[in-house]
Amino acid sequence: MEFDTIAAISTALGEGAIAIVRVSGDDAVEKVNRIFKGKDLTEVPSHTIHYGHIVDLDTNQVIEEVMVSIMRAPRTFTRENIVEINCHGGLVSVNKVLQLILAQGVRLAEPGEFTKRAFLNGRIDLSQAEAVMDLIRAKTDRAMNVAINQMEGRLSKLIGRLRQDILETLAHVEVNIDYPEYDDVEEMTHNILIEKATHVRAEIAKILETSKQGKILREGIATAIIGRPNVGKSSLLNSLVQEKKAIVTDIAGTTRDVIEEYVNVRGVPLKLIDTAGIRETEDVVERIGVERSKEMMSQADLVLVVVNYSETLTNEDEELFRAVQGKDFIVIVNKTDLPQAIDMERVIELAAGNRVITTSLIEEQGIDELEKAIADLFFEGTIDSADVTYVSNARHIGLLTQAGKTIGDAIEAIENGVPIDMVQIDLTRTWEILGEITGDTVHESLIDQLFSQFCLGK
């Protein structure tokens, strides 16, 4: 497959030590060589790096002092010739280098176009390409490991084996239908077909079992911190983040808006949402914050309900407990450094089997126990991202769910005595749906849409 030559800045814009301009295409080396003063880049070996200068051909002025990496096809990310120009960081110089390259007839790359070419040229499949963006966006080491495993093709291999099983079954059915007189081919009975289809459905279900945890590692747990004013919600946020993000005072109603922050809790990314204290108030601004707090609470995956150890439970406290019933929540009884006034038996009763943890955030007590409780709640205490193939992408989860339903329809049809040749339709559709995960059967418009979400230069 032939493409034109493209270029883009591959590093984040702004001041920094190094900025990289990436160029990919059949004549990438020749185009860069025109503006490079140093060794003749067309003569140097692949996978080598060379010192020199970028020159403006119109003025013969030296623009940048650079190191240029030469990587020749097919042993490159895009399977095309790639040149990477390492220049000084900053906005002006790197943009000037890019403009000089574009002036040589090179096109500015679209977002994700380098990765798209890697996919279209067969270096990676679609699930591996999507994992590139997951790696860039990973917020914890665990999330990074999941993305790397997918980039290395773990999910692709699982899907490939399932598609191969279905294909072999379809081929067997075809032979039985078209050549019934062949005695050397085993007859595809309804029982054999059910066995093979049931195996595929079980494998799909097994992959989907990891989807909840995989999605958490990829996107994080949306965690709302709720409670009455001045019970320690902002202190809890600061303790988990380990820096002061929220204002902490003795004045009730200090937090009037929603504060969001990502934090790594034992390998699990938490999207912490510190909400305004929930209470009846005449303050218009605070009342808006309270309404937003209730909205965030309803949308959260996990709710941390904070109550005050040194005060008796109020009607507002009990209303919060009723509001979180049916959700995953943990109760934090804070301020244990003060004399006890709260009825702990009533707290445990209201928690309805959910964890209750006592803390003194001012003395930094109880945070480790809270972090363990969160990991236990979502991962049963262990996250084995090294050995488990997590499916975390919403598109993949949707397609696997759809494939599971379609193969289920095939099994139901077989059990109801539908002719085997009619069952082929559901088997073929399952094979096609699974192929959409790896990009083998995906529509071109979807490919364009997926890669448009990538950052420029990737």
Curated annotation (Swiss-Prot):
Mg(2+) binds at S234, T255. Keywords: Cytoplasm, GTP-binding, Hydrolase, Magnesium, Metal-binding, Nucleotide-binding, Potassium, tRNA processing. Binds 1 potassium ion per subunit. Residues 220-379 form the TrmE-type G domain. It is an enzyme of class 3 (hydrolase). InterPro entries: G_TrmE (IPR031168), GTP-bd (IPR006073), GTP-bd_TrmE_N (IPR018948), GTPase_MnmE (IPR004520), MnmE_dom2 (IPR027368), MnmE_helical (IPR025867), P-loop_NTPase (IPR027417), Small_GTP-bd (IPR005225). Its EC number is 3.6.-.-. Signal peptide: none annotated. It is found in: Cytoplasm. Its main location: cytoplasm. GO terms for molecular function: GTP binding; GTPase activity; metal ion binding. It comes from the Bacteria. Its cofactor is K(+). K(+) binds at N230, T249, I251, T254. (6S)-5-formyl-5,6,7,8-tetrahydrofolate binds at R22, E84, R123, K458. GTP binds at residues 230-235, 249-255, 274-277. GO terms for cellular component: cytosol. Pfam families: MMR_HSR1, MnmE_helical, TrmE_N. SUPFAM superfamilies: P-loop containing nucleoside triphosphate hydrolases (SSF52540), TrmE connector domain (SSF116878). One of its GO terms (biological process) is tRNA wobble uridine modification. Homodimer. Heterotetramer of two MnmE and two MnmG subunits. PANTHER family: TRNA MODIFICATION GTPASE GTPBP3, TRNA MODIFICATION GTPASE GTPBP3, MITOCHONDRIAL. Belongs to the TRAFAC class TrmE-Era-EngA-EngB-Septin-like GTPase superfamily. TrmE GTPase family. Exhibits a very high intrinsic GTPase hydrolysis rate. Involved in the addition of a carboxymethylaminomethyl (cmnm) group at the wobble position (U34) of certain tRNAs, forming tRNA-cmnm(5)s(2)U34. This is tRNA modification GTPase MnmE. The lineage of its organism: Bacteria, Bacillati, Bacillota, Bacilli, Bacillales. The gene is mnmE.
